[in-house]
From Swiss-Prot:
Its EC number is 2.6.1.9. Its cofactor is pyridoxal 5'-phosphate. It is an enzyme of class 2 (transferase). The modification N6-(pyridoxal phosphate)lysine is found at K221. It comes from the Bacteria. Belongs to the class-II pyridoxal-phosphate-dependent aminotransferase family. Histidinol-phosphate aminotransferase subfamily. SUPFAM superfamilies: PLP-dependent transferases. This is Histidinol-phosphate aminotransferase. GO terms for biological process: L-histidine biosynthetic process. Pfam families: Aminotran_1_2.
Length: 365
């Protein structure tokens, strides 16, 4: 008996695997540190706006997220007409791929780039080409070497998840200058709000001065609205127009839009989260290093910790040990980093408990 067959290449796509849900020994407090969620939750103003929207759930949203686009425009000094909003930046990435990729096309990503990139690329029949990284960091020359006449998109998470590394803005500009004009450079800035380096820029300036660069952002991380699925992109008017033609007519909900407006306006909440992240990122990196572990320098709200390969001391062993203590980190086998764990920077209590547990783990015979 025949049955429906997916389009070519769909079954070759590895499903996205999110950070695991908390499971621990009975009676033990659990800390989920596997999905890079903020330990502070959203702004109280965002929560109030979300609850206030419940009075009119019978109404459709304004289809273009106008109020949110205007709030983003005010916050960043951008033209709202060049902003498109989506159900998380994931939807934006998929819309980009759906608009500009097809069979015979190629998109480039780096070795340890975000796992949504291959999904978005291959779902549209295109081929994902991998550019090797150098020291777990994007190598601009490696990307440029992979460009072919079939290249249509370059995916660049800056800073990158899961490594936490970033590309200085001068290198991003060099990348843009080296790409053909028909190639769109996608600068995924999901973690941009956490970066405090003087040589870093999210890329908005490039969008303003070129016709082939876009920047995507999310409200899921520092703004704490992951459950609402809300994100945005700033790009050239013609790219935004093309994407709007295939965007779902009511793709972002009223509660999500209003909560995001309140979140972006609460700069004090953002600054508090940023300061906490910087303090504990430095502390965690130092403490793990004291335990003999290698930590990849991070500018994000997480750290990448590398474990030995000796039996009983591996990342998988550490993951099992920590999970039993109610400390849930992210294993990275599906990223090709089986010897590392990614830890979201949590509350002071959670951070200290993880270091204590890792010390106990490393002290085992």
């Amino acid at each position: 008996m025949s049955r429906p067959v997916p389009n070519p290449g769909i079954l070759d796509i590895a499903p996205y695997t999110p950070g695991k849900s908390p499971v621990a020994e009975p009676g033990r407090k659990v800390f989920k540190l596997s999905a890079n969620e903020t330990p502070f939750g959203p702004s109280p103003h965002a929560i109030a706006a979300y609850k206030g929207a419940a009075d009119h759930l019978e109404d459709y949203p304004e289809g273009t997220s106008r109020v949110l686009r205007e709030a983003i425009g005010r916050a960043y000094g951008l033209d709202p007409d060049r902003i498109i909003c989506g159900a998380g930046s994931d939807e934006i990435l998929n819309l980009l791929a759906h608009t500009y990729l097809g069979p015979g096309d190629e998109a480039i990503a780096t070795t340890y780039g975000f796992l949504v990139y291959p999904i978005a690329t291959m779902a549209n029949g295109a081929k994902l080409v991998i550019a090797e990284e150098k020291n777990l960091t994007c190598d601009v020359d490696a990307i440029l070497a992979k460009v072919s006449p079939s290249t249509k998109l370059v995916w660049l998470a800056n800073p990158n998840n899961p490594t936490g590394t970033y590309v200085p803005f001068d290198e991003v500009k060099r990348l843009r200058a080296g790409l053909p004009e028909h190639v769109i450079l996608v600068l995924d800035g999901a973690y941009a709000d956490y970066v405090g380096k003087n040589d870093y820029e999210s890329g908005i300036e490039l969008v303003s001065t070129t016709d082939n660069t876009v920047v995507t952002r999310t409200f899921s991380k520092i703004h704490g609205l992951a459950a609402l699925r809300i994100g945005w992109m700033f790009g050239p008017a013609n790219i935004v127009d093309a994407m709007n033609r295939i965007r779902g007519p009511f793709n972002t909900s009223v509660p999500a839009q209003l909560a995001a407006v309140a979140a972006i306006n609460d700069t004090a909440h953002v600054e508090m989260s940023r300061a906490h992240t910087e303090t504990w990122r430095n502390w965690l990196s130092e403490e793990f290093t004291k335990l003999g572990l290698t930590v990849t320098p991070s500018v994000c709200n997480f750290v990448l910790v590398h474990f030995p390969t000796a039996k009983g001391k591996t990342a998988a062993d550490a993951d099992a040990f920590l999970t039993k203590r109610g400390l849930v980190l992210r294993a990275l086998n599906n990223y090709g980093l089986p010897h590392a764990l990614r830890m979201t920077i949590g509350t002071e209590e959670a951070n200290r408990l993880v270091v204590e547990a890792v010390a106990d783990f490393m002290a085992q015979p």
